[in-house]
Amino acid sequence: MTTVEAPTTKDQGPTTSSDQPSAPIKFGTDGWRAIIADGFTFENVRRVAGAIASYVLKHEDPSRGVIVGYDTRFGSPSFARAAAEVLAGAGIPVKLSSDYAPTPAISYSVKNTGAAGGVVITSSHNPWNWNGVKFKAKFGGSATPAIMKIIEQETAAGAMPRGEHAGIEEVDLKPAYVRAICDFADLDLIAKAGFKFAIDSMYGSGRGVIAEIFEQHGIDFVAIRQEVNPLFPDINPEPIQPHVRMLQETVIRERCHAGFATDGDADRIGAVAEDGSFVDSHKIFSVLLDWLLRRKQWPGEVVRAFNTTRMLDRIAAKHGRKVNECAIGHRIFALSA
């Protein structure tokens, strides 16, 4: 089943919480987020990790372990280590990313290795002073509302299970993810076309991933904002206007055929056309859906959020596919798909 959702700032709005132990921690459409050193503290990260550990112990096979990853935000590696220690201390084996990694790389690792779930320290596209926690279910996607309700309840109950320390193994999650992308897309065909691209990682955890893929296949490109900078100077790491202005200028100046930008944890993408104009997500999804159905011959129905373009309906109808409309939110998508 193919799922399509339009990214918006509104649907991923920050979820605040106090750092007081009694304050409730609420999960939004794709995780819990708060301001660093206010609601987002080591204490609260451990509270959430304890709740996730309790969920895994009660509802999943804990021997399958949990994948833990993180983005380039301030303190993310340390917060990830704290979460990993809580999970391992509960008797759950942990594979901790050895470096910054895109959220989709954690999702892929969960699904590919058969893990019980995944924890990502990230605040996605929010301003620099925010951070958060996402939980990926055993199928690799965002946890369903039912799962998140259990985790919220476990958080409120102060769950902090203890067991024999199961150990933390540091692993590089990116190579397998890069190989999967290379196997899925016809990159040799793109290379033969002679296109030149601009890549903007927006100082986020997508840094170097697309560049590595292009380098492996001899695709010409220029890259901007690849360095780690937790302050995300002059932008929110969200691939929409006005934050893609530097990418637009680069595409024109370097005479690129197109430009691509990924957000803070590289699970959203924006595009710029050859003339420097911004290509919105609705057009990206439409092109992608047509490619998936026509070239890749993906089976199943199409699920889209109600805020996405009706072009998707026309493309689905052309290929004889039924369209199901759902509410906004990655975890709603997980349930609908």
Regions found by a protein language model. Give the residues of each.
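An N-terminal, well-structured beta->alpha segment
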Residues: 2-5, 11-13, 17-85, 89-90, ...
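Gly/Ser/Thr-enriched, mixed-charge loops and adjacent short helices
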Residues: 21-22, 131-254
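Proline/glycine-rich low-complexity loops and linkers
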Residues: 98, 150-179, 273-337
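N-terminal small/polar loop signature for handling phosphorylated ligands or for N-terminal nucleophile
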Residues: 54, 58, 62-130, 182, ...
